[in-house]
Amino acid sequence: IHYDIGDCLRSCCNPAGEETLSLENVCFDIDLCQAILSGYLSVAEGFLSDWDLHYLPDCIRLIPLELGLRFLTDHLDGNVYFHCDREDHNLHRAAVQFRLTESVEQQMPELRQLIDRLVKRQGIIS
C-alpha cells in the first residue's frame, strides 16, 4: 500500500513533471496531495490500519528518494536498466527525484498535519 500511494503522489504532485530540465521548478505540491489523499482515504479507510496511516508521510518521502537512488545507480552502471535519450538522462532524473525528496522533507510538518486533518475529517480512527 505504501509503495503504491507513495508512487502515485510522487508522480502526481510534482507539477514540473519527471522529465523537467529545470530543477528549480521541481516541488511537491501539497494542495494536489490533499486533493488526491482526500479521495484515496475516502475509499481506503476500510482497509488501512492505524500503522498504515502513521507511516503515510514517510512513504511519500521514501519513494522519490528510492527512485532517485535507482536512477543514480543505473547512471553509474552505464544506463543498462532505464531507457535513456541521452548520456546524462538518468543522472538528471536522479537529480529531479532528489529535489522532490528535498521538497517533501521541507514540508514534512505540514504534510503530517494534513494527513491528521484528513484522517479526522474522514472519521478514520487513528
Report each predicted region and the residues it spans:
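Sparse, context-dependent recognition of short Cys/His-centered cofactor- or disulfide-binding micro-motifs
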Residues: L41, P57, R86-H89
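ATP/Mg2+ or Mg2+-diphosphate-binding catalytic cores
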Residues: E66-S126
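Intrinsically disordered, low-complexity coil segments
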Residues: A44-W51, G123-S126
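Active-site activation/catalytic loop segments of kinase-like enzymes and analogous catalytic loops
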Residues: H2-G46, L62-Y81
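All-alpha amphipathic helical-bundle segments outside canonical DNA-binding/catalytic cores
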Residues: L48-I60
